[in-house]
Amino acid sequence: MPELFAYTDGACSGNPGPGGWGVLLQAKEGDRLVKERALKGGEAHTTNNRMELLAAINALESLSRASTITVVTDSNYVKNGITGWIHGWKRNGWKNAAKKPVANAELWQRLDEANARHDVTWKWVKGHAGHAENERADELARAGMAPFKP
């Protein structure tokens, strides 16, 4: 059975401003690439954090059945949010530690639902540090943003 990986990235020109998200999905058997699929999208007026979240959401929502997958992101916001902070937010009625509404709560809720359907391992990598798949995800995010740039 191949191992599944999703390499995700978001990009924004200005913050807020036009933005894009990209996903590189790969199925691997050992070091051998079995299948690959690229996803991208964007919005005219958004933030980098929203694009990072949408990349992860679209990666998981694109899977047609419950899967074991490793999601690789360069966003500490996404990784820390889904593996840690979200538990407190849910307990506190989607309020943060300062008792304020959680930013991007609707996207966090979507990610939480998508995450629950799969067996997900979340992994952080440093962005723009020569990680080939992360660089590809970044290129996809920039391509997703392109139609929305003036």
Curated annotation (Swiss-Prot):
What are the UniProt keywords, alphabetically? Answer: Cytoplasm, Endonuclease, Hydrolase, Magnesium, Metal-binding, Nuclease
Domain spans labelled RNase H type-1? 1-146
What is one process in the GO biological process aspect for this record?
A: DNA replication, removal of RNA primer
Which is a Gene Ontology cellular component entry for this protein?
cytoplasm
Q: What is its main location?
A: cytoplasm
State its location(s): Cytoplasm
Q: What class of enzyme is it?
A: hydrolase
Catalysed conversion reaction: Endonucleolytic cleavage to 5'-phosphomonoester
Where is Mg(2+) 2 bound in this sequence? Answer: 9, 138
Give the GO molecular function terms. magnesium ion binding; nucleic acid binding; RNA-DNA hybrid ribonuclease activity
Q: What is its EC number?
A: 3.1.26.4
Cofactor: binding details = Binds 1 Mg(2+) ion per subunit. May bind a second metal ion at a regulatory site, or after substrate binding.
Listed cofactors: Mg(2+)
Q: Which residues of the sequence carry a binding annotation for Mg(2+) 1?
A: 9, 52, 74
Q: What does this protein do?
A: Endonuclease that specifically degrades the RNA of RNA-DNA hybrids.
Subunit annotation: Monomer.
Which family would the database say this protein is a member of? Answer: Belongs to the RNase H family.
This chain belongs to the protein called: Ribonuclease H
Native organism: Roseobacter denitrificans (strain ATCC 33942 / OCh 114)
- The gene name on file is rnhA
